[in-house]
Amino acid sequence: MLTLDTLNTMLAVSEEGMVEEMILALLASPQLVIFFEKFPRLKNAVTADLPRWREALRSRLKDAHVPPELTEEVMCYQQSQLLSTPQFIVQLPQILALLHRLHSPYAAQAKQLTESNSTFTPALHTLFLQRWRLSLVVQATTLNQQLLEEEREQLLSDVQERMTLSGQLEPTLAENDNAAGRLWDMSAGQLKRGDYQLIVKYGEFLAAQPELMQLAEQLGRSREAKSVPKKDAPMETFRTLVREPATVPEQVDGIQQGDDILRLLPPELATLGITELEYEFYRRLVEKQLLTYRLHGEAWREKVTERPVVHQDVDEQPRGPFIVCVDTSGSMGGFNEQCAKAFCLALMRVALADNRRCFIMLFSTDVVRYELSGPEGIEQAIRFLSQRFRGGTDIASCFRAIIERMQGREWFDADAVVISDFIAQRLPDDVVSKVGELQRLHQHRFHAVAMSAHGKPGIMRIFDHIWRFDTGMRSRLLRRWRR
């Protein structure tokens, strides 16, 4: 069967202009205009999706099939182009009958052309074919536009669903343009309103706990860049201003001994006029012991020195993935559970903004894994937030899972974050030893987010940093009072 792409090629119909016109009409639709005004960060993300839209539309036009009636008419037109005028005159009745049977838009005009001219000349033959071709071009263009209109409606429907989802989650997850772009990519999944409302709910809880959000940002961005001396660094000229006494006097600031005749004190000059003291005067002149005025001035000069440049390289501390382990034991239920989930959502926000990965593991009696920064990050986040914290505590399994994950090449610079109240059994010696090896040899950092003030020091001693967020009633009231 004839494809639309082949028909466009045969009739020299360009679909590019129609595709561009359709996309411009889509971008100018009131829904998108209002959305871009409300969420300017997502405008760049949607605009970046335009090449994919164009490719999808071209693919749809390329794979579409032409209706059988139009295919038959096109085949007849192609065969008619090969006929001479006498041969065409012989075939004309069959051609007219075919056009009538196919309900071709050109049927009436073709019949009028033959009936209004008693003699079918070569010029009339050429005119007949030209108008027939024009009719086919109009039909092909109409077919392209119909398909594009169907695709536009479908695309607009999909975009509206994604806009609704992205608009709801943008305040919670989109910190910058990079995060907005990743959020838009994640919104391509099939989600219902009731699903992502769970993220909105925890986003509102996080907004009501600004200290928790601040803690997540401090943890997520705790690595700072540092300058590192570079070997065989080139020499660089440094110019500094140095203050020193000037040779040109400016003011009298005391008396000194010297041999400056022009600055002698009057009593010294008086001794020169006394014959008995003249030799004494010359002796003191030679020994530079004459009393003279001390005149001082100040001057600045430029001092030029060379030294090696010691801060050539800037070693940015790597911002690698997050491997977050969340304690789902019974003691972490209630408000602790809300805080732990909201904290993971805040880390997801940091990961999206900094183009990092965020991997969640729940530990109780077994380990459940979620990746919140992948293409299906929103679905994974919803599944994570739907979990209930009612298990036991097996923190050793959590650390073993972290250690196993860090063996992979893509996790070589990962940061481990353990969220718990740390009311658990002591860690086995082999786990403590392996964690110390990762910290010492591979510079992995282990963070503890303590939800209780009663965590066991023996467990928490293993961490590089301990971030405390006491969820006790007294601490909650104090935080609320400070706000």
Curated annotation (Swiss-Prot):
Homodimer. Interacts with RavA. The keyword Cytoplasm applies. Belongs to the ViaA family. Signal peptide: none annotated. The lineage of its organism: Bacteria, Pseudomonadati, Pseudomonadota, Gammaproteobacteria, Enterobacterales. Pfam families: VWA_CoxE. It is found in: Cytoplasm. Keywords: Chaperone, Cytoplasm. Component of the RavA-ViaA chaperone complex, which may act on the membrane to optimize the function of some of the respiratory chains. ViaA stimulates the ATPase activity of RavA. Its main location: cytoplasm. It comes from the Bacteria. InterPro entries: Uncharacterised_CoxE, Uncharacterised_ViaA, VWF_A, vWFA_dom_sf. One of its GO terms (cellular component) is cytosol. This is Regulatory protein ViaA.
